[in-house]
Amino acid sequence: MAFKQLFAAISLALLLSAANAAAVIEKRATCSNGKTVGDASCCAWFDVLDDIQQNLFHGGQCGAEAHESIRLVFHDSIAISPAMEAQGKFGGGGADGSIMIFDDIETAFHPNIGLDEIVKLQKPFVQKHGVTPGDFIAFAGRVALSNCPGAPQMNFFTGRAPATQPAPDGLVPEPFHTVDQIINRVNDAGEFDELELVWMLSAHSVAAVNDVDPTVQGLPFDSTPGIFDSQFFVETQLRGTAFPGSGGNQGEVESPLPGEIRIQSDHTIARDSRTACEWQSFVNNQSKLVDDFQFIFLALTQLGQDPNAMTDCSDVIPQSKPIPGNLPFSFFPAGKTIKDVEQACAETPFPTLTTLPGPETSVQRIPPPPGA
């Protein structure tokens, strides 16, 4: 059975289970901290949670380590190729933790440059708590998201066996790849289509770049990198005017705001006829953003796994934080209006947004970790 068909079946089963919950007496295990879970094996993850919130995410911040932990999930998970397997070659294990187990190999791959730092930070937690690297990467990414206001409530399943060999190079999309290349890559990895590719890129709402422009570090993709909102989908459609640093770097195009970076792949996917309307659909539509990202993130972290053999430990993931009440879901940054939009969707008009008051928006870099 193809992965997406299997995943859809599991998702339906989960929905039916939830619908019948009122009629079923659920057996739950009580952990030593007094909290209850659906499976006793999940209790151990509360210790992991407390440890990483304090010692990796610095008290639950949506900062540099959170951003890189989310990035690590994608780079570990997408490294799987059924097409290579059909040719008799090893195509990677997907969400199996190979990027941590074989970090000396995989973090040297060009698209993974910079991930060696977060792998180095995460490894001691894996060793301390005796969990598998694949499960830990998936868990840390979800906890990181829970620290970012506006993020969906994430499901978490355990059961990823340790990888036995590194993923091959060339399976992680690059900022300079064409839209065709990236669509083909995600389709090979999990039969994801062009719309689901856009859903994946919602992660850039809480992300920054350290390795595209060597002259500047911690450059965000939008003006609200600490909030999981649709602002990324607004600002990628604004006309680029300048580079935040040296410019002329492979995979970089001009951005609309000082201090903000725009990678070529985001720019082209936002303007491609196959993806532009889905891209625009997230503008000022937080509920769609949350629902679609929740689905695609779970699907990604089960690539290469049998969902039927995994244990649901979603009870351990903290409740997501709401977006601050003083901020709209989407807006034009100060100094920008509808006239700055390079609209590519021909089907529907661009949503009506307000412009924030004040001088032109200048985006601040993501601060380094405390003590760095």
Curated annotation (Swiss-Prot):
Residues the record lists as binding heme b: 204
EC class name: oxidoreductase
Recorded metabolic or biological pathway in which this protein acts: Secondary metabolite metabolism; lignin degradation
Active-site residues, Swiss-Prot/TrEMBL: 75 (proton acceptor)
Swiss-Prot/TrEMBL GO biological process terms: cellular response to oxidative stress; hydrogen peroxide catabolic process; lignin catabolic process; response to reactive oxygen species
Annotated signal peptide: 1-21
GO MF term set: diarylpropane peroxidase activity; heme binding; metal ion binding
Site note Transition state stabilizer, residues: 71
Keywords tagged on the record: Calcium, Cleavage on pair of basic residues, Disulfide bond, Glycoprotein, Heme, Hydrogen peroxide, Iron, Lignin degradation, Metal-binding, Oxidoreductase, Peroxidase, Signal, Zymogen
Biased composition (Low complexity): 350-361
Region: Disordered, residue numbers: 350-372
EC number: 1.11.1.14
Residues bound to Ca(2+) 2: 205, 222, 224, 227, 229
Residues that bind Ca(2+) 1: 76, 94, 96, 98
Co-factor binding comment: Binds 2 calcium ions per subunit.
Prosegment residue ranges: 22-28
Cystines in this chain: 31-43, 42-313, 62-148, 277-345
Activity sensitivity to pH: Optimum pH is 3.
Glycan-linked positions: 285
Cofactor: Ca(2+); heme b
Catalytic reactions on record: 1-(3,4-dimethoxyphenyl)-2-(2-methoxyphenoxy)propane-1,3-diol + H2O2 = 3,4-dimethoxybenzaldehyde + guaiacol + glycolaldehyde + H2O; 2 (3,4-dimethoxyphenyl)methanol + H2O2 = 2 (3,4-dimethoxyphenyl)methanol radical + 2 H2O
Superkingdom in the source lineage: Eukaryota
Family affiliation: Belongs to the peroxidase family. Ligninase subfamily.
Function, in words: Depolymerization of lignin. Catalyzes the C(alpha)-C(beta) cleavage of the propyl side chains of lignin.
Name used for this protein in its record: Ligninase H8
UniProt lineage: Eukaryota, Fungi, Dikarya, Basidiomycota, Agaricomycotina
